[in-house]
C-alpha cells in the first residue's frame, strides 16, 4: 500500500494580502508532491483561485475590535471555539506542519498545532510584523519574513528568522515577465487605481477630482481602470462619463496581475502584498498608506518602495485631488521617470520567494526530498 504524501496545513486571514502568499506557497509545495489544505474564514472563498472548497477548512475567529469587556469576551469566545475545532482538525488530518500567514484566523490552527507538538512557522510580509504573527512569534518553530531586519531588535526571534521574500502566485510571475513600456508622447496613459481586496473609499473620494483637474489636454489620453466599492460606483461613473474618459470600474478584479502588467501608473493602498507585487512586476506607483493602523505597517511598507525609487508615498491627509493631479501630471510629462521608477521597483522585488519558503517549510517539517515525492 502506497504511503500518502505529507500534508502541510496553511492558515491565513481571509483577505488577499494574507491569502495570496499562502496560495503561492501551496503551488510550490504541490509541485514537490506534498498535499496542502487551507484553514481560514469564510471571506477567503471569494479570493482563492488555488483552493477548491474541499481543500478549505473554515474555523471561527474574531478580529479584536475595541478593548471593552464585551468585545474582549466575544473575541475570546470565537477564538476558543475556533481552537477547539482546530484541535479536531489536527487529530483527524495529522499535518506534518502548520504554516501561518497572518490575520486572526491563523491563531486557532497555530495554537492547536503547538499543543500537539506539530512544527509551526509564520510568514509575515510587512515591514512591521502584524499583531497575530507577533503574538505567535515566540511560540512557533520558525519565522519567515519578506524583508530583512524586521525582528533584529529581538535576538531570540531573529535567531529563528529567515528572510524569504513574499511568495508570488503564478499569475504574478507571469505578469513580471511583461516588460514595462513607457507611454508614448501622445499615446494612452494607463492608470490602475486599487484599494486592496476590500477596496478603499478614499480612492473614490480623491481620484475622480484629481483626474478632472488634469484638464482636457490629458483626458483623451487616459485609460482609467479603477476598483470601486458598489456604494461609490454611481458617483465615480458620473464624473468619468462627464469627462468622456475611457474607463472601467469594478468592485474587484480577479485578473489583477494582468491589470498591473498593463498599467503605466498604479495608485493604491500599500498593503504588504500589493507592495511586493508592484516590486515583482516593476510598475511605478503612488502609494497611500492606510491611516490609523496601530503599527503603521502600511506606511513602513510604502517606505520600502519609495526609498528604492519605485513609488511616491503620500500620507492620506495630503492625498487631495490637487496633490494627486500634480503628481500624475508631472509623471505624464516625464516618461523617462516612469521607466526609472519601474526599474527601481523591480530591483526591490524577489521572484523566487515561494521556492525559498517551500525549502524552509520542508526543513521545519522534517520532510526528506524522497518523502515529498510520495503522492
UniProtKB/Swiss-Prot annotation:
This is UDP-N-acetylglucosamine--N-acetylmuramyl-(pentapeptide) pyrophosphoryl-undecaprenol N-acetylglucosamine transferase. Its main location: membrane. InterPro entries: GlcNAc_MurG (IPR006009), Glyco_trans_28_C (IPR007235), GlycoTrans_28_N (IPR004276). Its EC number is 2.4.1.227. It holds the Pfam family Glyco_transf_28. The gene is murG. One of its GO terms (molecular function) is UDP-N-acetyl-D-glucosamine:N-acetylmuramoyl-L-alanyl-D-glutamyl-meso-2,6-diaminopimelyl-D-alanyl-D-alanine-diphosphoundecaprenol 4-beta-N-acetylglucosaminlytransferase activity. GO terms for cellular component: plasma membrane. Pathway: Cell wall biogenesis; peptidoglycan biosynthesis. It comes from the Bacteria. Signal peptide: none annotated. UDP-N-acetyl-alpha-D-glucosamine binds at residues 15-17, 126, 169, 197, 298. Cell wall formation. Catalyzes the transfer of a GlcNAc subunit on undecaprenyl-pyrophosphoryl-MurNAc-pentapeptide (lipid intermediate I) to form undecaprenyl-pyrophosphoryl-MurNAc-(pentapeptide)GlcNAc (lipid intermediate II). One of its GO terms (biological process) is lipid glycosylation. It is an enzyme of class 2 (transferase). Belongs to the glycosyltransferase 28 family. MurG subfamily. It comes from Rhodopseudomonas palustris (strain BisB18). Keywords: Cell cycle, Cell division, Cell inner membrane, Cell membrane, Cell shape, Cell wall biogenesis/degradation, Glycosyltransferase, Membrane, Peptidoglycan synthesis, Transferase.
